[in-house]
Amino acid sequence: PAGLVLSRETGFSRTYGSNPYVGYDDVNNPPFLYDGPETPGQLPAVAHVLAVDINDDPVAYPLDMLSEMHVVNDKVGDQDIVILWKSGTASALDASSIAEGKDVGAAIAYSSLVDGKYLTFKFDGLRFLDDQTGSIWNVLGRATDGDLVGRQLEEIVSVNHLWFSWAVFKPETRVYQP
């Protein structure tokens, strides 16, 4: 209700919904116009990552890895978390029309603590479920069916970045390995 709507009347002649940097996130190319320090070579510079930093323990979760796993249960900064990934989000930096960009998906980090108990999660090919109750969860962290229906996971501050744009500020970042 308090959201703002973007206007197509920007005062510039650039077409709304178009990408002036086609192929910017092609992992075979260096970042266009980036003139900063080298980033750690753990990932291609323009790999899409979800970055989490809890208690000075930065971790990057590559979206291409998340697209295969859908769920990651992890511990960051002594806090148990879960990362949920869902397809359906286009890269704004791939094709000339943003809507036609490759599907990089969307990932969100949550605390896995619910009602004083830590849950672990899995993806069954269609849905997110917790191992403890079998409740079904959506990518927004809400239980939609089962014993925990209506419960909401607490979102953890996380940011979708290209690897170089995160690692330049947090070079000590651990890249998640399954």
Can you say where each PLM-predicted feature lies in the sequence?
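Mid-to-C-terminal functional-domain signal that highlights helix-capping/loop sites
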Residues: 1-178
